[in-house]
Design a protein with these regions (language model features):
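A contiguous loop/helix-start segment that scaffolds small-molecule binding in enzyme catalytic cores
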Residues: 50, 73-76, 255-297
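Hydrophobic helix-and-loop "lid/oligomerization" segment in the mid-to-C-terminal part
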Residues: 26-253, 268, 272-275
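Short, conserved micro-motifs enriched in small and acidic residues
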Residues: 8-16, 173-178
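Hydrophobic, small-residue-rich alpha-helical packing segments that form membrane-like cores
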Residues: 1-14, 34
Length: 297
């Protein structure tokens, strides 16, 4: 059972929790199975779920990035070759190349593709499923752009709400999180995108560092405004009955207004440096502090 008072656990996504649960089972069975070989997938899930790259997540990231050899993973190695990449794996590769490709199947209704790809050593299956997923990811990009083209950004700007809540029928539910992230980045405001899903609304949220969207989703659950949901500081998802949409909007806007928040575009720094000291050696030393990610820049 999860200890809700343990803040360490708030940094872990479901994949990480599953990994540690299986690790305990392996220890109980005194098995010699090497679960650490699968840490690459824990890190990919951590990055794609926008979890803070701090504490145990930072330890996992450092170990994986330092030790992982792309040639030992046939699926990732094949995908790298399709893009002509010949370098060591980075956090950006997981977040912007491999992650989106692996996730593309699930977003567009073919979740079995990634399972088949990552659970086989058969080179023919690896080739076919990798190419299929790359094609699906390209299709996802086109669908995503078509959705963005239909959004009235000027209207959203004129409404000037503290939290952007956008509803549209017939958005593919696998894309609402990406659209929410795009709106959040464009307006620098917490953003929620909802669409129809089997006679109920499905929502996905992306937030700014000054507004904990996971806490808001919990409040909405406690108030029975939404049917179910969950999340963390920066992202979350939920389902809600259509007739509760205005209630949701009003509750979130009021909650935001009642909080004393630091500006979302305010960044703190530890010291000032002269431009003259920025050179290759300085950048190399800075990179030694990595890998960098959410809440760790």
């Amino acid at each position: 059972k999860k200890n809700v008072n343990n803040k360490e656990q708030q940094y872990l996504c479901a994949t990480s929790l599953t990994y540690f649960f299986i690790d305990i089972l392996i220890q109980k069975k005194n098995s010699d199975f090497r679960l650490s070989n699968f840490l690459i997938y824990v890190l990919m899930a951590t990055i794609c779920d926008v979890m803070p790259l701090r504490k145990i997540n930072k330890i996992i990231a450092t170990n994986v990035i330092n030790d992982f050899n792309i040639k030992t993973n046939a699926a990732f190695n094949f995908i790298f070759k399709q893009f002509g990449i010949k370098k060591k794996l980075t956090i950006d590769d997981l977040g912007y190349l491999l992650g989106p490709i692996i996730n593309a199947g699930g977003r567009l209704g073919y979740s079995n593709y990634a399972t088949e790809l990552l659970s086989t050593d058969n080179p023919n299956i690896i080739k076919k499923k990798s190419i299929d997923l790359i094609k699906l990811n390209n299709k996802r990009k086109i669908l995503e752009q078509n959705i963005l083209n239909k959004i009235n950004f000027d209207k959203i700007k004129q409404e000037n709400k503290n939290v952007i809540i956008y509803y549209k029928d017939n958005i593919h539910e696998g894309l609402i999180g990406i659209i929410a992230a795009k709106l959040k980045d464009y307006f620098n405001k917490p953003s929620i995108v909802l669409t129809n899903s089997n006679n109920i609304l499905k929502g996905s949220a992306r937030s700014t560092p000054n507004y904990n969207i996971g806490q808001i989703i919990k409040k909405l659950l406690d108030k029975k405004i939404i049917e179910n949901g969950g999340g963390h500081n920066m992202a979350g998802g939920f389902t809600i009955k259509k007739n509760n949409f205005l209630l949701l909007d009003n509750f979130i806007q009021k909650d935001f207004s009642n909080k004393i928040l630091a500006p979302s575009n305010e960044y703190k720094y530890d010291s000032e440096i002269s431009m003259s000291i920025i050179n290759n050696n300085f950048i190399n030393e800075l990179n030694r502090l990595g890998p960098f990610g959410s809440y760790n820049l």
